Amino acid sequence: MKKSYRVKREKDFQAIFKLGQSMANRKFVIYHLKGEHKHFRAGISVGKKLGNAVTRNAVKRKIRHVLMELGDHLKTEDFVVIARRGAEELDYQAVKQNLHHVLKLAKLLEEGFEIEKKS
């Protein structure tokens, strides 16, 4: 993900947490706030309770990959994805389905967009 698509600064994270809205499912929480950018910006937070650094980085890589894949269909808002316990056990397809579900609940995806389900 390009740097311009990332939320990196602490004050940006805090603004999204304080002023934004949240939506959650069992594996992920999303806080989102309307931004003044031409594209979405995403921050990813994976707590130490999920496992060691290798495990946490693997979860972040999966989330980043899903966001890049869905990038053309995301609305221009700033958001933070927080991984909950159990997210470390998910394979890529499950991460994609769970993120799609919570992004849809938060109304951050374009209307009518659905992911293809593999059988």
UniProtKB/Swiss-Prot annotation:
GO terms for biological process: tRNA 5'-leader removal. It catalyses: Endonucleolytic cleavage of RNA, removing 5'-extranucleotides from tRNA precursor. It comes from the Bacteria. GO terms for cellular component: ribonuclease P complex. PROSITE patterns: RIBONUCLEASE_P. Keywords: Endonuclease, Hydrolase, Nuclease, RNA-binding, tRNA processing. Its EC number is 3.1.26.5. The keyword Hydrolase applies. The keyword Hydrolase applies. It holds the Pfam family Ribonuclease_P. One of its GO terms (molecular function) is 3'-tRNA processing endoribonuclease activity. RNaseP catalyzes the removal of the 5'-leader sequence from pre-tRNA to produce the mature 5'-terminus. It can also cleave other RNA substrates such as 4.5S RNA. The protein component plays an auxiliary but essential role in vivo by binding to the 5'-leader sequence and broadening the substrate specificity of the ribozyme. Belongs to the RnpA family. NCBIfam families: rnpA (TIGR00188). Consists of a catalytic RNA component (M1 or rnpB) and a protein subunit. This is Ribonuclease P protein component. It comes from Streptococcus equi subsp. zooepidemicus (strain MGCS10565). The lineage of its organism: Bacteria, Bacillati, Bacillota, Bacilli, Lactobacillales.
